[in-house]
């Protein structure tokens, strides 16, 4: 079983959870079920993004919801952002920044 880690900014904000919590109860439950399947190694509909270190988990409900993540060491899945098809480019750009921040802070903590 894989561990899921959710990105948190330096000031303690969690963009993914803020996005997920903005969804209806039905969609929150469906997102949580999908994340549970990811923990079990069952990713479903996903792809690596071009020109990015991120991958995109495509959800077949709502407004074309997407979850952006990075698998690290084949164990930890870092969930960095969520959004829908209408704001996809902006969300990916921001998720790339979040991933860079996460990796930089992780490197700093290793020293």
Predicted regions and their residues:
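A short, surface-exposed loop/turn module that caps and links secondary-structure elements
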Residues: 33-59, 109-111
């Amino acid at each position: 079983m894989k561990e899921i880690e959710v990105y948190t900014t330096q000031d303690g904000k969690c963009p993914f959870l803020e996005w997920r919590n903005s969804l209806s109860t039905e969609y929150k439950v469906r997102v949580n079920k999908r994340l549970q399947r990811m923990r079990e190694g069952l990713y479903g509909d996903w792809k690596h993004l071009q020109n990015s270190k991120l991958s995109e988990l495509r959800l077949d409900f709502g407004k074309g919801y997407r979850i952006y993540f990075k698998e690290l060491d084949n164990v930890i899945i870092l969930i960095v952002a969520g959004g829908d098809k209408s704001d996809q480019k902006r969300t990916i750009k921001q998720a790339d920044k979040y991933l860079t921040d996460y990796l930089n802070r992780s490197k700093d903590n290793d020293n």
